[in-house]
Amino acid sequence: LKGEKALYFESRATTQFACQYDSRFSYCAYIPENYDENKSDRYSLAVIVHGSMRNAQQYRDAFIDFAEETNTIILAPLFPGGITEPWESDSYKFVRVKDVQFDQVLLAMVDEISKRYRVASDRFLLHGFSGGGQFVHRFFYLHPDRLMGVSIGAPGNITDLDTSAPWYVGVGDYEEKFGVSLPLAQMRRVPVYMVVGGDDLETWMINDKDAPFWKSGLEKAGNTRVERLRTLRDSFEREGISVRYEEIPGLGHEGFQVLPAVKAFFQTLLPPR
């Protein structure tokens, strides 16, 4: 150990650490109380991706109970606004924008935390809601081999598995854009959960055709987040990707209220303690 002061900031609810791969980005973590530097057992990893409000630490804190119950380390990345241009707030949702590869930033964070703690980082759990839901399903398209399971919560815009539409409306030019073919066989092996509030029906934000990242064709997925997540589910199932799908009655666009259902899904994927 590097001393009590260092250990204090690196245990349980950690401080915010700059990502060494690219210090414009940072992350915090939660390390279960029973973690012992002198033991050899490895902990599972769950990555929780914030939405547009960037409340990464709040999401980390909301998973403390899950971490303690399941011996899971929680990683909560922070993708600040204004990265690709001043005042923009959406670029991370689309995974790769201009010269920024947000998926590689996240993988670098996973690598960094795996060097500090005994964590099974080769495959991890991934959840995101709203803007985070946009990021995680597109990350899934790029790196299914790294995922133990993915939870997609109420994304405002979706990337349909439609080969007739260009990225990020569809995946028609996926190979041209990313240099590899869409890894459908690997995607079929990853457990997928989709969740949205049954009353998540506001449309003003997700149908703004003047928004910087709007593309013609996004509207074809539906008018509301509920309709769009149903479209994404149907898209997955047409390609043989099994989906556990849930609309929570009476719930609007409330990311913290879906977490009990997300945790229940994650628990089905972890080995019993």
Feature locations, PLM:
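Phosphate/oxyanion-binding active-site loops and adjacent basic polyanion-contact surfaces
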Residues: D22-S23, K98-L106, A165, T224-R225, ...
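Serine-hydrolase catalytic machinery in alpha/beta-hydrolase-like enzymes
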Residues: S23-F25, D41-D122
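Alpha/beta-hydrolase
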Residues: Y43, V47-V49, G153, V196, ...
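Short beta-to-alpha linker loops that shape the active-site pocket of alpha/beta-hydrolase fold enzymes
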Residues: L78-G82, G156, L251
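Conserved hydrolase catalytic core segment
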Residues: R138-M148
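The feature captures the conserved acid-bearing segment of alpha/beta-hydrolase catalytic domains
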Residues: G149, A154-E239
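C-terminal catalytic histidine-bearing segment of alpha/beta-hydrolase fold enzymes
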Residues: V226-R273
